[in-house]
Amino acid sequence: MAKDAIKLRAKVLEAYSMDDYLVELENKQQIKAKISGKMRVNRIRILPGDLVDVELSSYDLTKGRITYRHK
């Protein structure tokens, strides 16, 4: 997912658990996103309303991975 990933900015709408989130992309599309491994290891908290960077696979545009939380 590294080479052909699509990077977008999104806003977190809802937190389902510590790993699963509902995010809204810049084009108003809502997708499910999981937190990346580095963010999980470093225990970075993500709350509803946060702006995050999401990577989407070109194979499945309905699921993403949160890679960065903006301050």
Swiss-Prot record:
Residues 1-71 form the S1-like domain. GO terms for molecular function: ribosome binding; rRNA binding; translation initiation factor activity. Its main location: cytoplasm. Transmembrane segments: none annotated. InterPro entries: NA-bd_OB-fold, RNA-binding_domain_S1_IF1, TIF_IF1. Keywords: Cytoplasm, Initiation factor, Protein biosynthesis, RNA-binding, rRNA-binding. Pfam families: eIF-1a. One of its GO terms (cellular component) is cytosol. The keyword Protein biosynthesis applies. One of the essential components for the initiation of protein synthesis. Stabilizes the binding of IF-2 and IF-3 on the 30S subunit to which N-formylmethionyl-tRNA(fMet) subsequently binds. Helps modulate mRNA selection, yielding the 30S pre-initiation complex (PIC). Upon addition of the 50S ribosomal subunit IF-1, IF-2 and IF-3 are released leaving the mature 70S translation initiation complex. Component of the 30S ribosomal translation pre-initiation complex which assembles on the 30S ribosome in the order IF-2 and IF-3, IF-1 and N-formylmethionyl-tRNA(fMet); mRNA recruitment can occur at any time during PIC assembly. This is Translation initiation factor IF-1.
